[in-house]
Amino acid sequence: MSTKEKLISHVMKEEPVGSRSKVTVVGVGMVGMASAISILLKDLCDELAMVDVMEDKLKGEVMDLQHGSLFLKTKIVGDKDYSVTANSKVVVVTAGARQQEGESRLNLVQRNVNIFKFIIPNIVKYSPNCILMVVSNPVDILTYVAWKLSGFPRHRVIGSGTNLDSARFRHLIGEKLHLHPSSCHAWIVGEHGDSSVPVWSGVNVAGVSLQGLNPQMGTEDDGENWKAIHKEVVDGAYEVIKLKGYTSWAIGMSVADLVESIIKNMHKVHPVSTLVQGMHGVKDEVFLSVPCVLGNSGLTDVIHMTLKAEEEKQLQKSAETLWGVQKELTL
């Protein structure tokens, strides 16, 4: 008799039980690992699968996390074979090519499209009912690509979008007012990154509109220069990259925030990237961030934001830029 047999006597033969809340992270780079640890520490799933083409890095990261199993409640698995991801509820895609020095954005996009042509069909094969969350950049275009390649309905393909931009925005407003970010209600919509749109008309604390107190807020004529905050939001990522080489923690926490709303069916409103054709005067098939309701079925509803004419115009301009890039892609 083995030690195990001497120690344990079976009462019944256990049937294999599938995971009830499995999450997969594709890509074990800085963003993938920050997302993984954020999901683990928030205890959002009973199984976390990780997949990447870089076998040694993947194996090392999985082992490192598994060594902390005592401190977690989640089963952690990893393999370069996508079968390890089977029956995931949410699949987070962080994999993608990095921008080379002097490389055009369009060229980077096409390289990432080619990577997605391998990743997305594999996800669909093993988790045909999952909710796809795209984090790889440029996120709005790649969410469109994932939607096209997956054949999924639009409510099951979500881009992490401006969830992080809005978090940065609220943090900086909080710094200026000496308040916690959760008490500063503010939204950034549109394209994630350089041409994002801050909705100054909606910024409020305890229901008090800041633009009501300072009608010039967010404009060039504002003596308090609130507009600089949005510039800080846009420059924030570049600043972090300059200082530490990449961004990871905040985007990882942002991903876990979105995963939580889906897994726990919270019906919470987040600014995430979705198909905005027909909204705010957008005519083309593009994905941009608007406030959306996230729950167990994915993206269930879109909130109709009241935007000023100037804000709407910025949104349409972003849409045109994205469509210009998308129509050149070979899918």
From Swiss-Prot:
Top-level lineage group: Eukaryota
Name of this chain's protein: L-lactate dehydrogenase A chain
Self-association and partners: Homotetramer.
Any one GO MF annotation of this record: L-lactate dehydrogenase activity
Binding site for NAD(+): 29-57, 98, 137
Pathway of action: Fermentation; pyruvate fermentation to lactate; (S)-lactate from pyruvate: step 1/1
Organism, as annotated: Lindbergichthys nudifrons (Gaudy notothen)
Entry's family note: Belongs to the LDH/MDH superfamily. LDH family.
Any one GO BP annotation for this protein: lactate metabolic process
PROSITE patterns according to UniProt: L_LDH
Catalytic residues (positions): 192 (proton acceptor)
Cell compartments where the protein resides: Cytoplasm
Catalysed reaction equations from the record: (S)-lactate + NAD(+) = pyruvate + NADH + H(+)
UniProt-listed Gene3D superfamilies: Lactate dehydrogenase/glycoside hydrolase, family 4, C-terminal, NAD(P)-binding Rossmann-like Domain
HAMAP family referenced in this protein's UniProt entry, alphabetically: Lactate_dehydrog
